[in-house]
Swiss-Prot record:
Residues 42-105 form the S4 RNA-binding domain. One of its GO terms (molecular function) is RNA binding. The keyword tRNA processing does not apply. Belongs to the eukaryotic ribosomal protein eS4 family. It comes from Schizosaccharomyces pombe (strain 972 / ATCC 24843) (Fission yeast). GO terms for biological process: cytoplasmic translation; translation. Pfam families: 40S_S4_C, KOW, Ribosomal_S4e, RS4NT. Signal peptide: none annotated. Component of the ribosome, a large ribonucleoprotein complex responsible for the synthesis of proteins in the cell. The small ribosomal subunit (SSU) binds messenger RNAs (mRNAs) and translates the encoded message by selecting cognate aminoacyl-transfer RNA (tRNA) molecules. The large subunit (LSU) contains the ribosomal catalytic site termed the peptidyl transferase center (PTC), which catalyzes the formation of peptide bonds, thereby polymerizing the amino acids delivered by tRNAs into a polypeptide chain. This is Small ribosomal subunit protein eS4B.
Amino acid sequence: MVRGPKKHLKRVAAPHHWLLDKLSGTYAPKPSPGPHKARECLPLIVFLRNRLKYALNGREVKAILMQRLIQVDGKVRTDSTFPTGFMDVISVEKTGEHFRLVYDIKGRFTVHRITAEEAKYKLCKVKRVQLGAKGVPFLVTHDGRTIRYPDPLIKVNDTIKLNLETNKIESFIKFDTSAQVMVTGGRNMGRVGTIVHREHHLGSFEIIHVKDALDREFATRLSNVFVIGEAGKSWISLPKGKGVKLSITEERDRRRALKGLA
């Protein structure tokens, strides 16, 4: 009889966006319980060893972490399987590097370097707003944070700008047409665009129509949309490609053009 949670994760069952090859072992790192879901996170060991190449194996990753050199959202993390996720800020003290976890146009976490100034804040999507004990208002964000006494104008699906040093809300963006968004789920994952139209469907999913920088329109569910800026201006720096998805022929032409320049 099976008792308790699973403590192992087979390599073939690991999320595809971790980009682990099947022949390098039987098992993959099992994410610890934390602020992000297991299928939507990137364990610290995968980020440091497989993406940054700062370590050759898990033992070296553990040695780096136990020196308390790695911070996630301003807090030192020593757990090699700590689940980092979308919008998290990872800082490496020795090198002075800062990274923000965002998706590329293929829906994978990309190594996106940011400045020290940008590393002082992160954006959080509001998942819930309600009253707690003794009538205290609070909100819950996509990364599991609970913030008491928020601005009464902040509603569900809005995005807050959180100062990681003070853990206070600096500003917020309303979820509305003309807001700039990044898609965090579905087949359009990683694409960036502007909200054009919102379809309301009672008893079903609300559909959001988004137009990207090339004036291509696509639709996705409301739950897959994360507001990252106001009209025409993103509050965070974007990775290479700026969230614009090219067709197969356009990617081919761009590769040929780059090869011709080389």
